[in-house]
A protein has these predicted regions:
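N-terminal hydrophobic/helix-forming segments and targeting peptides
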Residues: 1-216
C-alpha cells in the first residue's frame, strides 16, 4: 500500500477518487446516460459537478469514437482537473433537447494505492515475473482477459508444479503509477533475481506478442 502524497521516484501517489453516481437527464427528467448502467459513461477522475447546461456546451464534454460509432470509449483525466461523459457517436446524434441536467457525484480524498502480489517459491531463487493491470473497468480484452489468464496461471502452477525449479512472482497493479510504485520498493530485488518477465495485456485478441530485450 502506498499513501496519497508518497513520492515514488519523480512521481507522487495521487488522491483516491470515488464515484457514487453520474448521469445526464433531459428537460423532461428522462435519464439519457447513467453511470450505474454503463461504467464507461464517465471520464474517470472527473471532478464533481451538478447543474443545467445547454446542449452546445454539453457536447463539448462528451467523448465518442468516430471509428466505432456504436462503442462507448474509455477516457481518463488523471493529471488534469476536468469532467466529462462518454457515449457512442450514434447515441450522441439523438440528443435533441436544448438543455440538460448533469450530475457527477465524485470526491477526492487521501487514501491508498494498493498492489496485489503472489509469490511462489521454487528450488531456485531465480524468478519468472508476471504483471498485469487492474484499473480498466468493464472491458473484456483490456484488461479482464489478462487478469483471468494470470489468475489461471497461478492456479495451474499451484496444482501442477508444487515443487517448481524456478520461483514465480505475480503482480496485479494500476497501470503506470502502480508499476512505478512497485519498482520504487522492489527494483533491487528484481534486478538481482528476475530471469525474465511477462507484461500481460489485451490477451483476448489475435495480435502477436512483443519481445523487449533488456538494456543489459
Amino acid at each position: 500500500r502506498f499513501k496519497t502524497g508518497t513520492k515514488v521516484f519523480d512521481w507522487i501517489v495521487p488522491q483516491e477518487w470515488n464515484i457514487k453516481d453520474a448521469y445526464i437527464k433531459d428537460s423532461s427528467g428522462k435519464k439519457i446516460l447513467d453511470f450505474k448502467k454503463n461504467l464507461l459513461s464517465i471520464v474517470y477522475y472527473s471532478i464533481p459537478i451538478k447543474k443545467w447546461i445547454l446542449k452546445k456546451d454539453l457536447i463539448k464534454k462528451i467523448h465518442f469514437d468516430n471509428k466505432l460509432p456504436n462503442a462507448v470509449p474509455y477516457v481518463t483525466s488523471y493529471y488534469k482537473k476536468a469532467w466529462g461523459f462518454c457515449m457512442s457517436k450514434n447515441r450522441l446524434k439523438k440528443l435533441n433537447k436544448k438543455k440538460y441536467f448533469i450530475n457527477i457525484d465524485t470526491n477526492f480524498k487521501k487514501g491508498f494505492l494498493e498492489i496485489g502480489e503472489y509469490f511462489k517459491k521454487g528450488k531456485n531463487k531465480k524468478e519468472i515475473f508476471f504483471s498485469t493491470y487492474i484499473c480498466h473497468p468493464s472491458m473484456a480484452n483490456d484488461n479482464l482477459s489478462s487478469i483471468a489468464v494470470q489468475l489461471n496461471l497461478i492456479k495451474y502452477l499451484k496444482e501442477n508444479y508444487r515443487n517448481s525449479f524456478f520461483s514465480y512472482r505475480f503482480v496485479f497493479l494500476p497501470e503506470t503509477i502502480g508499476s512505478i510504485c512497485y519498482l520504487s520498493k522492489k527494483k533491487d530485488k528484481l534486478k538481482k533475481n528476475m530471469m525474465l518477465g511477462f507484461a500481460l495485456s489485451c490477451l483476448g485478441d489475435d495480435h502477436n506478442y512483443s519481445l523487449i530485450k533488456s538494456r543489459n
